[in-house]
Amino acid sequence: MAFLNEYDKLNIIGKGGFATIWKVRHIKLGYVRAIKVSNEMVEDENDPAYQSFLNECKVLLKIGNGSHPNIVHIYQPRLIENRAIVEMDYVDGETLNEYIARKHFVPIDEVFRFADEIVRALAYCHYDIYKFLMDPNVDNIKSDPNDGRKYIIDKATEQELVAKYAVTHNDLHSNNVMRRNYDGSFVLLDFGLAIQNGKAVKSSSRRGGALEYMSPEKFDDSSVISTQSDVYSLGILLYEILAGRVPFLLDDKAYESNPTVAGFEMMKFHKETPPPPIEPLRREAFEKANPRQTYIKDYPEWLENVIMRCLAKNPAERYANAKEVFDDIQKHKSEKPSTRDDNSLLNDLERLKNDNQRLAAENEELYKRIENTSDTNMSLNDQI
């Protein structure tokens, strides 16, 4: 059955108060995409609700214009049958939340891949986006006399442009990150609550974010939200993929019965309680995923330090933006192994020991099966 005259509905991906997201196939062109469709009908292109939708999309189009591989590609918004719609790439995969729930323990190379891809994507929003959004005439940027395709931007001007054009995602959580099935790469989704230059991209400036990922300052005053609020939520994501769970757990049943009380408890956690150390939780996740093996710490101490700095209660004690997080991670990764982890050789030897124990156990099980098969065959021969 045709949907909005152009699409075949495949299934609902998600639904919120403002819009529903469908997986669809274009009837004539055959491509498969996701489309965000407003729940409420609008009268025409002059309807304030549609204009608000367009304002949201203006920045989102520049963020998700296909220039960054780890940000979902967004296409031109339109009005069809009195519904505001915008197409975006359909990401065939699972959410980070689903991935962690399935794996229990995420291998360290996957943790670093997540850090490389999602932290870099957020750094693009917090910092590099000015290169695509700035207007040389409005921003009074001079061209390079030796190369008219380039601009002369000193450090002070760059910082002004970063402050003006930085986009705060404002809704980072593990259901807004996807892991592609075909190559395992991570993709950042849903900028519907994004904020630029202190103003909500979407007309509704409601405080954004899932409770487990909200920075302490968000509970007090949504007007103080900045890139450092995103850094806190990013720290929760990094903590979650390394530890196998978020630092502060929300009791779903308590939230359903009394969301106000549960929300207040979560606020107290974020404001007052230090995050639990990561290693015991990572050990627990490892043992759940690998019950016959011995856990050995497999990540450098500096990684936990980076995460804990992201999770500082005071925004001033965090990184200023995701670019600083990304640069710090890359700096540590580029250090020589001897300075990164004094116990790396011992850890490698212990892993080999674990592998040998596992293979020995598997071989023993195989021999038992062979013996049982042999005994069964002898018994059958005796009967014959």
Predicted regions and their residues:
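Conserved activation segment of eukaryotic-like protein kinases, specifically the C-terminal portion
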Residues: S204-K218
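Conserved short submotifs of the Hanks-type protein kinase catalytic core
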Residues: E81-T95, Y99
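Activation-segment/catalytic-loop signature of the eukaryotic protein kinase fold
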Residues: P77
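AlphaC helix of the eukaryotic protein kinase fold
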Residues: V42-G64
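Conserved catalytic-loop aspartate of Hanks-type protein kinases
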Residues: D230
